[in-house]
Design a protein with these regions (language model features):
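Glycine-/Pro-rich loop/turn segments that contact NAD(P) or position catalytic residues
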Residues: 1-43
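Short amphipathic alpha-helical patches
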Residues: 10-12, 38, 62-63, 104-105, ...
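Short alpha-helical "patches" and their helix-cap loops
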Residues: 22-32, 79, 153-167
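C-terminal substrate-binding/catalytic lobe of Rossmann-fold NAD(P)-dependent oxidoreductases
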Residues: 25, 30-147
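NAD(P)-dependent Rossmann-like dehydrogenase/reductase catalytic/cofactor-binding core
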Residues: 123-180
């Protein structure tokens, strides 16, 4: 998908341009598909929506909206969600709701910022931002990775290890002519 995936490639490009420095990856605001699935897997949860709220400097808050099964106790559900290692590193608040579907928005985003040094020149600042439909972009990146997989030796790869041109449809020569 896009993280890990294309975000890893962008982070690598930022580091290529400023090898010494620090990169902050700030997700959101938006729906985290992975965190929503993890919250829904908690006993007593009928449906869940986890929103990622950027707090800056690579830190995040999680707002988790849950539809409870009949008889489920909010305090137990909240404790189970907060104890999950997937949520443990972030400030997490759990809200009971009548309908998760009424709140659902498939939007998400990311803002990556790098401050670093290129050679001897300090104070380089880079910024990459996107606002997306989470499932649509995830699917697109997966299709591109599947395309690239046909051009790789057998094995397991991260998107960072695959030449970008292998992810694109079309003739490599034409792509180079158009993109360079």
């Amino acid at each position: 998908g896009w993280d890990p995936g294309t975000d890893s490639v962008v982070r690598a490009l930022l580091e290529l341009m400023a090898p010494r420095g620090i990169t902050f990856t700030n997700f959101g605001p938006g729906m985290s598909m992975g965190h929503s699935v993890a919250a829904k897997a908690v006993q007593g949860v009928r449906a869940a929506l986890s929103m990622t709220i950027p707090a800056g400097a690579g830190r995040h808050r999680r707002l988790v909206y849950v539809e409870l099964e009949p008889g489920a106790e909010l305090a137990e559900v909240e404790a189970a969600i907060k104890a999950d290692p997937y949520f443990a590193q972030d400030e997490t608040t759990v809200y009971p709701v009548e309908s998760v579907k009424d709140l659902q928005d498939l939007g998400h985003g990311v803002l990556m910022e790098r401050v670093g040094t290129s050679g001897q020149t300090a104070n380089q600042r880079f910024r990459w931002e996107m606002r997306i439909n989470n499932p649509a972009l995830t699917a697109q990146v997966m299709v591109s990775a599947a395309r690239a997989s046909l051009k790789q030796q057998p094995g397991a790869y991260t998107l960072l290890e695959i030449p970008p041109i292998h992810c694109l449809p079309g003739d490599p020569g034409e792509l180079i002519k158009r993109l360079v």
